[in-house]
Amino acid sequence: MTDLEIETVSRVSSNPDEVKGSSVVEEEPDSESTIKSRVSDEIDEHDSIPEQSNTEKSIEINDKNLEAEKDIESNLSLRPPEDDLDSRSIESEQTGTLSKQTTSTSEAPQDLKIWKNISNASNQNSGKLNPQLFVIEAFKHMSKAKATKRHKKLREAINNVQIELQKQPFLLPEVILEPLVMACQTNSTTLLTITLDCFAKLIDYNYFDSPTLNPSDITLMERVVNTIASCFCGESTPERVQLQIVKALLAAITSERTIIRHSFLLTAVRQTYNIFLLCKDSTTQAIAQVALLQMVDSVFQRLSTVLNHEREFSTINMNKSSSNGTPDRANSPIPSQLSENKLTLESFEHRKSFDQVREEAPLEEDSLEQQLLRDAFLLIRALCKLSIKNIPYEHEYDLKSQSMRSKLMSLHLIYHILRTYMNILSDINVKIRSPTSTPTPLIDAVKQYICLALAKNVVSHVLPVFEISCEIFWLILSELKNFFKSELEVFFTEIFFPILEMRTSSNQQKIVLLNIFHRMCEEPQTLIELYLNYDCISGNTENIYERAIVTLSRIASQSTSDPPPSFVFRDDQLVIDKPGFVYHTLNDIPQLNSSTIGSYVHSHNPPYFDYQIRLKSYRCLISTLSSLFTWCNQTFAPTVEITAKDDETESTSKGEEPQKSKSEPPSAGINSTSMDNLESSGQALATDDPSQFENLKHRKKQLQEAIQKFNYKPKEGIKILLSSHFIASKTPTDIAKFLISTEGLDKAVLGEYLGEGNDENIAIMHSFVDHMSFNDIPFVNALRSFLQKFRLPGEAQKIDRFMLKFAEKYIDDNLGVFKNADTAYILAYSIIMLNTDLHSPQVKNRMTCQDFIKNNRGVDDGANLSDSFLTEVYEEIQKNEIVLKDEQDPTSNFPEIPGTSNLSFAANISNALATVGRDLQREAYYMASNKMANKTEALFKDLIREQRERGKLSGNDIYYTARHFEHVCPMFEAVWMPILAAFSEPLQLSSDPALIQLSLDGFRLAMNVIFFFSMDLPRNAFMQTLTKFTHLNNTSELKWTNMHALKTLLEISLAHGDKLRDSWKDVLLCISQLERVQLISAGVDINSLPDVSTTKPLRKSLDKNIRQSRSGSISLKHSKSFQSASTHSTKSSSVEIVREYSSREVVMAVDMLFSNTRNLGSEGIYDFVKALIEVSWEEIECSLELSNPRLFSLQKLVEISYYNMRRIRMEWSSIWSLLGTYFTQVSCHENSIIASFALDSLRQFSMQFLEIEELSHFKFQKDFLQPFSHAMENSQDLKIKDLVLRCIDQMIKARYQNIRSGWRTIFHILAYASKIENLLVLQCAISVVSSLGHEHISCVLTQGAYIDLISCITKFAKLNGNQKFCLSCVDMLKNLEHELIKHLKHMKKESVYSKKLEEEYWLPFLLSFNEIICEASDLEVRSKALKVLFDCLYRHADDFDEEFWETVSNKALLSIFSILSITNSQRLYLAKNTEETEVWMLTTMVEALKAFIELIKNLFERLHFLLPKALNLLEKCICQENSMISKVGLSCFSQFVLKNKNQFKDVDWDEIINSINQLLQMTLPIELRDPSLYPQVNSDSSLEDVKENSFRPHEISRFNSQSVFKSKKHHLKSIVVKCTLQLLMLNCLWELFHSDNMLTNIPKRKMVKLLDILKQSWEFAESFNSDFEIRAKILSSGIVEHMPNLLSQEALCAKLYFYTAFECMSSLKSDSHDTEEYNDLMDVFQKKIYLASQLVLHGFQRVIGDNPVKGVAAFQPVIAALVSYINSLDEIQFSRGKSEFYQLLCAIVACGHIDQQLGTSLSNAFLRYAC
């Protein structure tokens, strides 16, 4: 039928023959009685659900309209469907007179006015027109009919009307209606045809549009509808009459001036529906089908028009109200009132009629909108109940049957309503109101019926039913998911997932369902919200999103037979590209008449159906990834701008007010004890905060893991649940509450845990049972319910404990049922045994009912239970085994398939033979689908009851709307592993191009999401998998799949380089293998190209800055698929594939990959370089044994260095930290080819890099040239060292002007080269240094490399064996002085000069000479350096301030003499060559000492502050064991004092005298008095005894060993050295004091201190000489040959003392003799002289007794000098000590031993006294 024919149904010609002639097929009908019974059930509500509520009482109301009212109001309380079982049928026989109707459903006058206004606005030409012409004609034909003549009343009524029509043009509708009604009560086909046609035309002209005066009466139109409907009498009704009935009813329902509602509307729809089903003519069926569609559209279009009108009207009123400042709240119900008036079952029980409710209800309850809403509700409910009619198994595939056509028609109408009028259903403000309950949205009122309709039909194996049911589900999922949150979970988990996973479901079902999943995957919003509302919500909710992806991945991974490459699908064979399998479009309802519907009977299986299903699954996965990435790139409004109103519309499923305002904090945190607290707060997650949802997901995962642990080890699982706060506390109550309310627990494990015999488990079990309720439940049902909570363990003691507690609980809940708990216990135990006996396959002789009764005799406290009760129990157990639902046989409890009932053994054999031609898969699915449907229906009932009990809105009912892209990250992390497995399978096993392309597309899309969120673990897994499938390690097995994988890998790498991170290693390793394949294809021997991925040499570790551990990668198992697949390709094709790897496209892609590194970010280029370094090192390591090692990646490193050289310094420094380290390592490689290549590449790169200007104080060049330095220091190959120097030389010559910080590295390299003992390398280094010294010194100075230059030249100046070059280096330094002066002058001009800066230049310069002086091997070089140094100091003495001179003296001068600070033994240990050290000390050091002292001596006025340092240095020299050094030191000391005696100040003299004191103390042999060095000697022994025994061996034996003796011998030698130094020092002082005017320059007070110093040495010598015991010990020790003495020191000290004292006294002559100072000094000197005279006299007397000859010879000059000094005193001085001197002279004479000189002196003295 064409669209034009459908649109003109309401205008069918009045001649029924015209329509009759268009009939297409006329079938043989069933018997009339059968059809009537079937039709009467089509809309009968009593058969909707086969159960009836036990709690609701039936309400007897005769009025059919009130029954419809009750149907609506009963649904407002959201009762489950079983509570509506007693409602009256919307289909009833219209018997009796219409006047007896007590209640009217006509519209109120005000509503009629509104509707007329609306109708007039839409149709200005509508209204009452004069129908005289066709009425007269109709009545004329009626009067001529034969039937009219047989009915007197009818004939009279017709005649009356004809007469009245002749009198007046217009008659009242009641007048015309009466004969028409009478005509319809006849059985005349002619009369019925004419009458119905007349009705239709009158309705078109709105003739019956007359409101009744009494609102309780029915309208004329309603009477007309009843009359028209009564004309249909089943299939026996003539087809012409049926067509006219359809036309008339359609005109009535679609009338724009009147509204047919409630039972009258349903009556019209019912009769049209019956005609559609029962009519034999296919054309009439088609017309009836279109009429039904237009009736439905009329109802909802009228409702839509009224809703739009009222919204506009309310908007105007709101604007007026807001302008007046007073909002209109009259129509807003008070919440407290609404809660009080909530409709309940009890209110129905006490309600007498709806009249009182109507009278008390507000006026708005009777509004037109509410009336139309009730019509819509009743219509949808009726269609839903029609769709769930059960169809016998054998008739399910007969699509032409009336029951199947009825089901399909109802489903299509439901789909049409949902699709077309979704705006009405999805509007939460469209609410059905009731005076006794809160307003209920229309969608909530019809939701339960739609769900039940889907549950019954979506499991159907009849494909048209299944597909239209899936389409309805899709509309709900896409548009109404916020209203069906809990219901959608049931559909997914109980129906759709099982269908996809079942083997018995057909491929057609799977492809239809995959189409729905594909649409779901294409909508990002739907996917995200599925994840938020199911996967992230804790509790028992299924992970819908995750399971959907896992299921799709599993289907995609299934093995199928792929079509051969030559196979091409026709359009009708490729079903995956079509929107539906049966219905290619659902924009219009398909023709369901009996002639056309047969085309759906034979479902076809297109070729390679499994393959197409697999393709569809891949498309679903790809759509999922595409949707996720699309969602990532969307822009969302800021969450903070969401208002409370937004939350109301976007965060809740039922339009309720949010439970908390935004200012209030959530009631519970994520980590609280129970997650229900968080979800029960409607506002807690209203804004879908990603972090909170991530925590929720984590929390749910924790719960699932804990449950899994419980199912494995229950006690450990309980511990985890407690620690994670899923169980509030350790109390048995809390644990039992969790166990009984949590799904997913293994019931067998739970039974074992609860049955444990310890006290804790028993307490938990008791609490577990106490949480159950058995109130008013039969005993067997209670026991069955009890045993559904867990699996009863097999141990008898455990069973006993369970039964005891059950009996106790049952008796508590049902007092009086049994006499005591023992009865319940015994009976329960008996039933358990009976259940086992009747249903265990091991039991052969089963218990009979009499046996069971006998076993239970006297169990009720001695009394018997009734036999009927026990028989009922037995039969119940026999029919229905007590078994866990999860373990129940899926074939049980379902309608038996015909021919499969329990038969005998022989009959079963016959049936087995009979199944040969049966569809066993279909039968298995039929049983499984029935189970799914029943279970789903039960879940919906429980769900609705639960919602009613806990309130309309709870935490789990809140529907969260996605607003954040951050949700995508955890979504992908939850499913990436099955997705990866699915996409890997075709690449691994398939050769089908479509599958491979889909897989690679999946990889691309997955990587988009991965890179967007920078997920490490998935990235590594996907990239490693993709690189693995390039299969480049085996060129003989390459396939086109591998080529495509490589191209995809390159595309991903080019597009997402910044995000690859560690995966760059896999990509670059693959490119390295690609280069190997290209070389092989070019003819290179494969043996000379080792594969990096397969060769595993002994790896050398990279530097830790380069190498990082890579964790989290997933290694995929190697499969033999490549080997098996390779057998299908010929050798020629393999060669062709290998050549393709060298194609221009691949080569350009690889080149672009490296050239595009300049576009990578800072982190991206860092990761790229790091990975390329690792690959390069692996290439090198795997090809060490080859003559030409692989250097591909090393070359690429140089390339990318060129590309990225111009990056900002921060990025380049990061890159070079890797490159520099790697080039440093490679340049020292043991393979010279590799090292040379690295250095040469680095040289070329350096030439480019040095072109870039470097600013001051940066060190990029220094770091860049560091690999050269490392190669010079660490390479063992002299050729590499020579290459380094040549590279440096070339860089200097070409880029010296641009070198800044690089000079430091260059000079460091050259300095190190000076240590190499190779002539060629040394000559090259010398050449470079010479060139620098003569050509580029000024450039180096300006570039800040001055110190490094000096250090370099200094090291070359110290070379051994090349005197000429070393002298030239000293000259370079000398010339550098002039350049330095110029540079400093330039700095002064540039205003960057400072004194400190100048000194920073001078000090390194001076220190370089110090280094040469101390370390140069050639004496002439050292001497020249020494001369240049001191010449420079003389020239610039005035330029240096005192502080800098201090620095110079300490670091550049005094450090030369640092060797003097160590002992001889240390010197011998430290010096490499003792002889050279001695020579250096006697030559260079002595020369340096003289130069230093000479410097201070000549510049003393400028350098007087260095006097203490100079004296300290001289002290060290004088105290050396080397006599030459000591003498030089004494000479320098003497000359220094003499030279500057006139410039010394008092403080200087203090330093000098202190120095003299220090020298005398240091050279004083105090060790002579250490008794531990010598053996004990008897004090009574004479000198002769000592001499006699001094060399006896046995006297020496007291020493412990010869080594001890040698040690003491050496110690004595040091004592002798001290004695010698003491004499030298005294002689030096003697000569110094005898110099001209020496003593006169020393202050007299200082001389007193000097005398005390001299006397200390004198007294020590005198004391030693007087100690015979010590001297004897020394002699007896054998370490000396003669008796030791210190006569020379004693005599010289005495002589020097007297000379000094008398000279000081003599110098006082010129002073004033009267001054006090003079007298004090004279007294001091005289006293000292007198005491000293006594000391010398005592010594003279001692030597006369000990050794007269030698002693007298030593003391006589001293005595003579003393007497001579006395004689030299002037008279005043002589007279002051005259008496003391006289006594001294007398004592001398008394001693005797007076020689001529002494005698002469004494004579002169006495003569002076005589005078």
UniProtKB/Swiss-Prot annotation:
InterPro entries recorded: ARM-type_fold (IPR016024), DCB_dom (IPR032629), Mon2/Sec7/BIG1-like_HDS (IPR015403), Mon2/Sec7/BIG1-like_HUS (IPR032691), Sec7/BIG1-like_C (IPR046455), Sec7_C_sf (IPR023394), Sec7_dom (IPR000904), Sec7_dom_sf (IPR035999)
Keyword Protease: no
Cell location: Cytoplasm; Golgi apparatus; Golgi apparatus, trans-Golgi network; Cytoplasmic vesicle, COPI-coated vesicle membrane
Domain SEC7: 692-880
Region called HDS1 domain, residue ranges: 889-1103
One cellular component (GO) term of this entry: Golgi apparatus
Compositional bias per record (Polar residues), positions renumbered to this chain: 92-108, 316-326, 669-688
Motif (HUS box): 533-537
Residues recorded as bearing Phosphoserine in the entry: 40, 332, 353, 741
Keywords on record: Cytoplasm, Cytoplasmic vesicle, Golgi apparatus, Magnesium, Membrane, Metal-binding, Phosphoprotein, Protein transport, Transport
Ranges of compositional bias, category Basic and acidic residues: 33-49, 57-73, 80-91, 643-663
Residues found modified as Phosphothreonine: 326, 742
Region (Disordered): 1-108, 316-336, 643-688
Highest taxon of source: Eukaryota
UniProt keyword Flavoprotein, yes or no: no
GO MF entries: guanyl-nucleotide exchange factor activity; metal ion binding
Entry note about domains: The homology upstream of Sec7 (HUS) box is necessary for the allosteric activation of Ssec71. The homology downstream of Sec7 (HDS) domain 1 is required for recruitment to the trans-Golgi network via its interaction with activated arf11.
Chain's role: Guanine exchange factor that acts as an activator of arf1 at the trans-Golgi net-work and is thus involved in vesicular budding and traffic between compartments of the Golgi apparatus. Activation of Arf (ADP-ribosylation factor) GTPases is essential for vesicle formation via recruitment of cargo adapters and coat proteins necessary for Golgi trafficking. Involved in tunicamycin-induced ER stress response and subsequent apoptosis.
Protein name (Swiss-Prot/TrEMBL): ADP-ribosylation factor guanine nucleotide-exchange factor sec71
Organism lineage: Eukaryota, Fungi, Dikarya, Ascomycota, Taphrinomycotina
